[in-house]
């Protein structure tokens, strides 16, 4: 979950950056992508090693998990994280955490699911 939040924050920063700052952030995005690729490949290697001899396809499992990004359990986890980190995340609006974390998490998870789908589509 922490990796997903860091990835989402990085992507949002690049999206809203001024044009002259996008070059700098572009380097950060490249590093995030490289890190993601390394994590993904290591996870695949570990998964394949553990499931050797079983009829389980890593990519199918990943696709099924992507569909779960924007689900009830992840919404609950996001809201809990938002409320716990309200001062950092919401700043002056921290007292409104119980009211705004739900909609914010709904949007963040929808965006994260779209990003995951887009990355997954690029790999096909």
From Swiss-Prot:
Organism expressing this protein natively: Californiconus californicus (California cone)
Protein location: Secreted
Keywords of this entry: Disulfide bond, Neurotoxin, Secreted, Signal, Toxin
UniProt remark on domains: The cysteine framework is XIV (C-C-C-C).
Span of the signal peptide: 1-17
Tissue-level expression: Expressed by the venom duct.
Entry GO CC: extracellular region
Source taxon at top rank: Eukaryota
Residue span(s) of the pro-peptide: 18-74
Name of the molecule in the record: Conotoxin Cl14.12
Keyword Secreted: yes
Keyword Cell wall biogenesis/degradation in record: no
GO molecular function, one term: toxin activity
Post-translational modification: Contains 2 disulfide bond.
């Amino acid at each position: 979950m922490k990796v997903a939040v860091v990835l989402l924050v990085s992507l949002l920063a690049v999206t809203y950056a001024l044009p002259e700052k996008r070059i700098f952030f572009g380097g950060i995005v490249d590093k995030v992508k490289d890190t993601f690729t390394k994590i993904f490949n290591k996870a695949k290697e570990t998964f394949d090693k553990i499931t050797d001899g079983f009829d389980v396809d890593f990519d199918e499992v990943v696709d099924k998990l992507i569909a779960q990004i924007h689900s009830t359990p992840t919404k609950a986890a996001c809201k809990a994280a938002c409320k716990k980190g309200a001062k950092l995340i919401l700043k002056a609006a921290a007292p409104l955490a119980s009211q705004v974390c739900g909609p914010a998490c709904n949007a963040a998870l929808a965006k994260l699911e779209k990003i995951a789908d887009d990355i997954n589509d690029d790999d096909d």
